[in-house]
């Protein structure tokens, strides 16, 4: 009688016992009258020794990635043949029976880490790519993370509830994926971009602690690392302040990292206002794993002879500077030219520089710095081999452009510690931003966020100055999640709709069902949504979220595996009252 086990169950207690393993052939080596087979399953690897003449005939047919069943006796290997790179390297199975469960065609790429296969091949044969150890472990970690989330939140009295995936189309920035209704001719469902409205309705229902590991859908233009469908942890709570969300998420993420990676994070994350983040890091999602802080030098250049900077200051602009200590030798003229071109992408008027040699400014705009030389040297402790970069522009443009220069320089100088996880809360965001193209205000995050109390009475007088009860969670320079305390009265929600250009009739048409619900005793409530895919990408040091999604789409929102999206027969279209026009016209 053979005991069926997995590869990871091999141990000393099974020596000389008869075992059975069902697994895949990772490697097979023929040595005359002996064949060695390395088996792999989800759990581990094991070596099989075949020396029986009848079985050798079977092994002569076996190739890599065949799925086979092996029965045999577990033995210790000779001490000089122990493979210390395998956990089971001290054991081998002396084969008594071998059955080929199924054969494997010629492989499109080798099933090994760092196999250099192109992305489309890996996606087309995703079921093979998932056999690679590195890739497999990422998907297993995903399961562990979602399991930890469910356990933690359930113990905190949260209800895991499922909101609809066929919803009314209420575009929130990106385009909706639309699903035509066969029953309701000419009408369409949308796939949700987020469960936002429904989780708020859940709070109005009195179900005060909700979470969902939610599938979300956005029909966005193709761009490197976007996926048309993605997963987020969605949380909403009643009768709370943002502090409650901060504490909950800090404890949850601490538990996730401890349980899955055995990493102890700080129990309290850093906090920073939006204004400070922009001024100091040039980003509302700053990477704080390295210092390289942006300086505001506007007040010094009021005395400068450099008219370009003086004119910008007179027009209420700003001068942002980045000081790179003891690295001037690493910035050749060609490298500086590249940085100047990079700055132009962000619509700034230019990137300027000056190096320090022999206790003097040299190169770039050095000749315009003589009047303020001593002030800058003393204020910033400047020394030889330092280099300063300057951007002069409107506040927002200068901050964002210098923030991108900061990131590029940090990458080029390898300043980032890849093995650390720096979490950060950003809060006090503007509630609205002005769109120069439409000449209208739009929600900076979304339309359901509560303005801070001091702005509510004067909301319409200067929307660009209004701050919201809005917060983002940032990890290693990436936005991991976003949340807010929500509007909970119809009157205030209607005012916000009006500010962003939704007149009463449009608001009623799109959101009437939600506005009506706000008239039935809505509680104070708020929440957050965390990108599961992005969290896992960072946890696994992956370069793409595709690596942590079981069956992802490619960069063009298509699936090489099943060839989705695909055309459908005309009879299906007729049932839906649809016709396809020639897209070329």
Swiss-Prot record:
Origin superkingdom: Bacteria
Catalyzed reactions: tRNA(Asx) + L-aspartate + ATP = L-aspartyl-tRNA(Asx) + AMP + diphosphate
Residues annotated as binding L-aspartate: 172, 218, 445, 486
Subunit (UniProt): Homodimer.
Record EC number: 6.1.1.23
Matches recorded under NCBIfam families: aspS_bact (TIGR00459), PRK00476.1 (NF001750)
Job of this protein: Aspartyl-tRNA synthetase with relaxed tRNA specificity since it is able to aspartylate not only its cognate tRNA(Asp) but also tRNA(Asn). Reaction proceeds in two steps: L-aspartate is first activated by ATP to form Asp-AMP and then transferred to the acceptor end of tRNA(Asp/Asn).
MF terms (GO), sorted A to Z: aspartate-tRNA ligase activity; aspartate-tRNA(Asn) ligase activity; ATP binding; nucleic acid binding
Site (Important for tRNA non-discrimination): 31
Aspartate: annotated span: 196-199
Major site of localization recorded for this protein: cytoplasm
Protein name: Aspartate--tRNA(Asp/Asn) ligase
Family, per entry: Belongs to the class-II aminoacyl-tRNA synthetase family. Type 1 subfamily.
Coiled coil: none
Gene: aspS
UniProt subcellular location: Cytoplasm
PANTHER family, A to Z: ASPARTATE--TRNA LIGASE, MITOCHONDRIAL, ASPARTYL/LYSYL-TRNA SYNTHETASE
Keywords: Aminoacyl-tRNA synthetase, ATP-binding, Cytoplasm, Ligase, Nucleotide-binding, Protein biosynthesis
Chain sites annotated for binding ATP: 218-220, 227, 479, 531-534
A Gene Ontology biological process term: aspartyl-tRNA aminoacylation
Record-linked InterPro entries: Aa-tRNA-synt_II (IPR004364), aa-tRNA-synth_II (IPR006195), aa-tRNA-synth_II/BPL/LPL (IPR045864), Asp-tRNA-ligase_1 (IPR004524), Asp-tRNA-ligase_1_N (IPR047089), Asp/Asn-tRNA-synth_IIb (IPR002312), AspRS_core (IPR047090), GAD-like_sf (IPR004115)
Gene3D superfamilies: Bira Bifunctional Protein, Domain 2 (3.30.930.10), GAD-like domain (3.30.1360.30), Nucleic acid-binding proteins (2.40.50.140)
GO cellular component, one term: cytoplasm
């Amino acid at each position: 009688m053979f005991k069926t086990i997995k590869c990871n169950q091999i141990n000393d207690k099974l020596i000389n016992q008869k075992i059975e393993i069902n697994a895949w052939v990772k490697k097979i080596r023929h040595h005359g009258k002996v064949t060695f087979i390395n088996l792999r399953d989800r759990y581990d690897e094991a070596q099989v020794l075949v020396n029986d003449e009848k079985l050798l005939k079977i092994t002569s047919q076996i190739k890599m990635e065949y799925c086979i069943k092996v029965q045999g006796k577990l033995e210790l290997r000779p001490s000089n043949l122990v493979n210390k790179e395998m956990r089971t390297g001290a054991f081998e199975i002396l084969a008594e029976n071998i059955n080929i469960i199924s054969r494997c065609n010629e492989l499109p790429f080798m099933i090994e880490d760092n196999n250099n296969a192109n992305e489309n091949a890996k996606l087309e044969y995703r079921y093979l790519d998932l056999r690679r150890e590195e890739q497999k472990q990422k998907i297993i970690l995903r399961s562990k993370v979602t399991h930890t989330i469910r356990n933690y939140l359930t113990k905190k009295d949260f209800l895991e509830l499922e909101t609809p995936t066929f919803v009314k189309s209420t575009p929130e920035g990106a385009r909706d994926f639309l699903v035509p209704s066969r029953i309701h001719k000419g009408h369409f469902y949308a796939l949700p971009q987020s469960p936002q409205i429904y989780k708020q309705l859940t709070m109005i229902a009195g179900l005060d602690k909700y979470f969902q590991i939610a599938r979300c859908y956005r029909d966005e233009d193709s761009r490197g690392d976007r996926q048309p469908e993605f997963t987020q942890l969605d949380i909403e709570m009643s009768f709370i302040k943002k502090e409650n969300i901060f504490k909950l998420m800090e404890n949850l993420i601490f538990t996730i990292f401890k349980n899955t990676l055995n990493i102890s994070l700080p129990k309290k994350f850093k906090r920073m206002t939006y204004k400070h983040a922009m001024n100091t890091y040039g980003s509302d999602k700053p990477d704080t794993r390295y210092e390289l802080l942006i300086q505001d030098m506007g007040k010094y250049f009021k005395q400068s002879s450099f008219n370009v900077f003086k004119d910008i200051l007179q027009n209420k602009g700003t001068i942002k500077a980045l000081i790179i200590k003891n690295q001037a030798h690493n910035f050749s003229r060609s490298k500086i030219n590249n940085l100047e071109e990079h700055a132009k992408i962000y619509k700034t008027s230019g990137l300027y520089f000056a190096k320090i040699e022999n206790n003097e400014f040299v190169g770039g705009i050095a000749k315009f710095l003589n009047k303020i030389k001593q002030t800058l040297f003393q204020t910033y402790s400047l020394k030889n081999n330092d280099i300063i970069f300057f951007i002069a522009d409107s506040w927002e443009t200068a901050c964002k452009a210098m923030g991108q220069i900061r990131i590029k320089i940090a990458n080029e100088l390898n300043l980032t510690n890849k093995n650390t996880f720096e979490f950060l809360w950003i809060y006090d965001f503007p509630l609205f931003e002005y769109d120069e193209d439409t000449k209208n205000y739009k929600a900076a995050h979304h339309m359901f966020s509560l303005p801070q109390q001091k702005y509510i009475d004067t909301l319409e007088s200067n929307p660009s100055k209004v701050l919201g009860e809005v917060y983002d969670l940032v990890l290693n320079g990436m936005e991991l999640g976003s949340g807010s305390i929500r509007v909970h009265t119809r009157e205030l929600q209607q005012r916000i709709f009006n500010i962003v250009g939704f007149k009463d009739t449009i608001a009623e048409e799109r959101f009437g069902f939600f506005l009506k619900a706000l008239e039935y005793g809505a509680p104070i409530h708020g929440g957050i949504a965390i990108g599961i895919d992005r969290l896992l990408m960072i946890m696994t040091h992956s370069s793409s979220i595709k690596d942590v999604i079981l069956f992802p789409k490619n960069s063009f929102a298509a699936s090489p595996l099943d060839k989705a999206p695909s055309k459908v027969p005309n009879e299906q279209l007729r049932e839906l009252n649809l016709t396809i026009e020639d897209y070329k016209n």
